[in-house]
Amino acid sequence: MDLETRLVFIDTSAYEVKKLQFGHFTLLRLQELIDAEKIHLLITDVVRSEIEKHLKKYAEEAVTAHRNFRKQGSFLCVAQEVAGDGLFPDITPEAVLNEAMRKFHALVDNGLTETVSIENVNPKQIFDDYFSGAAPFHRNAKKHEFPDAFSLAAVDAVAKSRHQSVYIVSNDGDMAAVADANASFIHLKSIDTLLDLVNRNDKELAELSTFADRVLEQLRPEIIQLARKILSNAEFIPYTTGDADPEISDVDILSVSIDELQLIDVTSDDATYDVTFNVELAASYDFQDYSHANWDKEDRVYYGVKHCSESFRHQEQYTAALQIGFMEGLRTNAEVHSLSFDDGLFDLNLDNAEYIE
């Protein structure tokens, strides 16, 4: 795919997919491309306010979780040689938020990222779209789409005034619908897709990108084997919209394959990819059925709880960061440097699983 414009607007949802980890991983590479003027990033004042609000929430939730862990895992203090000294620092939400804000502002206040105000957007245009059911107001929860509608209208005005198209990066289906209906907008589903597109269309990186892809194909069996090994030793968490509260008793990885690759960064010695794996696995569950159980107030226990075990086949997708090396630009030096999945705990969707007889 050819790069059609360097003008880019990234929705809050796309930043959240990357856990708002500004200055790290994919968002660090985004910042590097902006600094190199490979991307001209637009951010509306609405998105900026949303992110700052979410950073505050993330900081508070993370510190609360850390404090709970410190309390529950306090016994690890006796094994600092194994557990490390960094498990029990005394941190505050304010300190975490200040650092997160500093890194966010390094991206948006760098003299290159352009802040777009919504103050000149005509509210009548937005309300006409709302009452007519036009995107992004064409689904349920329409009122929640007002911030997105104002942001997109402001970005559209910038694109039209400069006679340019603009990439709209969002995993929000409503934003995608707006982009599809606007000749100035080109929708991309993720920041990873954007970085892959920029890297592969950069003259300085084009040959390196092609070479890195060939090295990756050479390493594909090793990558899949490593992913399978990690998943075989991983912890899985089932979830369902039903009333069941199952516990996993066993997981068997049946197959692992690579579904999608996005080139995040490449040099003469290594490359970083965002990899989506298709994973087929069989999981055995222990269920407790309380539907016909009776609560004994005196003994404070349920009687008549039914226990059963069932197995399900799952088709899941998990994303990981992959770094491969080829020192001195030689395929004979090809190696996998690291493979790190985005989450340490892997979700299993019981609602979409297939029951195994």
Predicted feature locations:
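Conserved SAM-binding loop
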Residues: 168
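Active-site-proximal, substrate-binding regions of enzyme catalytic domains
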Residues: 2-164, 173-226, 230-273, 278-280, ...
